[in-house]
């Protein structure tokens, strides 16, 4: 059976000797991220990736996601739900997110390291929390205060999932050809029209809700992100 061994010692070396994270202790989040705490997080992250996530790799290849045409639901491979719940309940989802939004407020480099372990152990599983983190970060970067309060805490907790909708039937990598658009309704809402395909994490049984992102801009070489509850 294929085995995954997280590069824990290499990560510890990089953080302590190359990045020298201790010298940033005056910055928000870094004061709590002592060498002992960093090592403990990396050790536990490795245990989770090696013991819980890695065994899912073969299961994911054998089963894949299963679609139920009667109720239009999607079931992820066996073990995915348990791994996702474990990840969210143990706080791995919110490791690098601000405490005021439900995260642990630790340096992003720790979150990236754990994310690398999870995705390396099983990329099929790692995309779910990975896309959720990406959508939450996009909201924190460009969302309104109302959107941040509504969506981010639920995503950081793992209750809601995130995805990104880019590919359309007529284009994939050439995003300048996208036709989907969002038109303001005048009341703060938007009417979104268009068709998306191949939406990773678009439907699953891991979270209660999916936060959908579309790309509604016309062909002006820019993209807009529209949060939507599915």
Describe these PLM feature segments.
Residues 213-220:
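Conserved small/polar residues in nucleotide/adenosyl-binding loops
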Residues 1-126, 150:
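Amphipathic, small/basic residue-rich leader segments at the start of a protein or domain
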Residues 117-120, 138-141, 217:
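Active-site catalytic microenvironments for nucleophilic, acid-base chemistry
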Residues 224-230:
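Hydrophobic alpha-helical segments, chiefly the membrane-spanning helices
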Residues 92-93, 97, 105-106, 110-114, ...:
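Extended, hydrophobic alpha-helical segments in both membrane/secreted and soluble proteins
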Residues 92, 99-102, 144-145, 167-171, ...:
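Short, glycine-/Ser/Thr-/acidic-enriched flexible segments
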Residues 131-132, 143-188, 195:
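Internal maturation/activation junctions in enzymes
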Residues 84, 152, 179-181, 202-205:
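A generic local secondary-structure boundary/capping motif
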């Amino acid at each position: 059976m294929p085995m995954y061994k997280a590069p824990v010692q290499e990560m510890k070396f990089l953080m302590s000797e190359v990045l020298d994270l201790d010298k940033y202790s005056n910055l928000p989040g870094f004061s709590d991220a002592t060498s002992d705490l960093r090592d403990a997080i990396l050790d536990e992250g490795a245990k989770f990736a090696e013991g819980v996530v890695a065994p899912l790799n073969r299961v994911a290849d054998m089963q894949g996601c299963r679609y139920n045409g009667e109720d239009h639901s999607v079931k992820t491979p066996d073990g995915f739900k348990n791994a996702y719940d474990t990840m969210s309940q143990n706080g791995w989802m919110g490791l690098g997110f601000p405490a005021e939004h439900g995260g642990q407020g630790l340096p992003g480099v720790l979150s990236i390291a754990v994310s690398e372990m999870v995705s390396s152990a099983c990329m099929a599983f790692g995309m779910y929390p990975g896309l959720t983190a990406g959508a939450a970060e996009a909201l924190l970067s460009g969302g309104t205060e109302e959107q941040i309060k509504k969506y981010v805490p639920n995503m950081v907790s793992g209750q809601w999932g995130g995805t990104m909708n880019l590919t359309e039937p007529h284009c994939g990598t050439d995003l300048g050809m996208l036709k989907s658009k969002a038109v303001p309704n005048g009341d703060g809402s938007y009417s979104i029209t268009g068709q998306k395909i191949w939406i990773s994490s678009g439907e699953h049984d891991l979270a209660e809700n999916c936060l959908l992102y579309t790309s509604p801009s016309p062909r002006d070489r820019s993209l807009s992100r529209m949060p939507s509850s599915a």
